[in-house]
C-alpha cells in the first residue's frame, strides 16, 4: 500500500524520520518508553528500503526531502510546509506512516493547528499503530480534530 501510494502521489514528498541520539534513554521519552529505537545512522533509523526510490522514480518532477524529528511531532515539518504554502498555496496534505497512534496523530494535529485551512488527509491503509486498538483510537482522534481519515 505505502509504495503504491508514494508512486502515484503527484506532489512533493517529505519523509519524516524519528531520530534519536545514543543517549536516548537519558531523555524523558526514553525514560517513559525505554526501548532504544531510531538512533541516528543505525539500521532502524533509515527509511524502509524501496520507499525513497519509489518517490524519486515518479514521473512527476516533485521534490523529495527529509525531516529528522527528535520527538513525536516536528515543528520543522510545520515550518517547512508554511514556507511552501507561502510560495505556492498547498491544496491539501496527506499523511501516512508509523505509528498512527504516536507520530502520525501528533503531526496531524500540529499541522491542523498550524495550517487550519489546509485539509489534512490520513490514508489509514498506509498507517499502522502499536496495536489495532490504539491505531483506531488515533484515527478517531484525528477525525474529531477535522482531519479527513480515508
Task: Give the predicted meaning of each segment.
Residues 12-18:
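Short beta-strand segments at enzyme active-site cores
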Residues 4-12, 31-150:
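Active-site-adjacent betaalpha module
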Residues 19-22, 128:
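Solvent-exposed loop/turn segments at secondary-structure junctions
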Residues 18-20, 72-73:
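Short glycine-enriched loops at secondary-structure junctions
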Residues 24-29:
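Metal-dependent catalytic neighborhoods of phosphoester/phosphodiester hydrolases
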Amino acid at each position: 500500500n505505502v509504495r503504491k501510494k508514494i508512486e502515484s502521489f503527484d506532489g512533493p514528498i517529505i519523509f519524516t524520520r524519528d531520530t534519536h541520539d545514543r543517549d536516548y534513554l537519558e531523555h524523558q521519552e526514553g525514560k517513559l518508553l525505554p526501548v532504544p529505537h531510531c538512533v541516528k545512522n543505525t539500521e532502524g533509523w533509515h527509511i524502509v528500503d524501496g520507499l525513497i526510490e519509489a518517490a524519486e522514480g515518479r514521473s512527476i518532477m516533485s521534490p523529495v526531502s527529509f525531516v529528522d524529528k527528535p520527538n513525536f511531532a516536528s515543528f520543522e515539518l510545520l515550518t517547512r510546509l508554511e514556507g511552501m504554502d507561502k510560495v505556492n498555496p498547498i491544496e491539501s496534505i496527506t499523511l501516512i506512516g508509523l505509528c498512527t497512534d504516536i507520530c502520525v496523530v501528533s503531526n496531524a494535529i500540529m499541522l491542523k493547528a498550524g495550517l487550519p485551512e489546509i485539509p489534512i488527509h490520513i490514508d489509514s491503509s498506509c498507517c499502522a499503530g502499536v496495536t489495532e486498538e490504539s491505531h483506531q483510537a488515533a484515527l478517531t482522534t484525528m477525525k474529531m480534530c477535522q482531519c479527513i481519515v480515508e
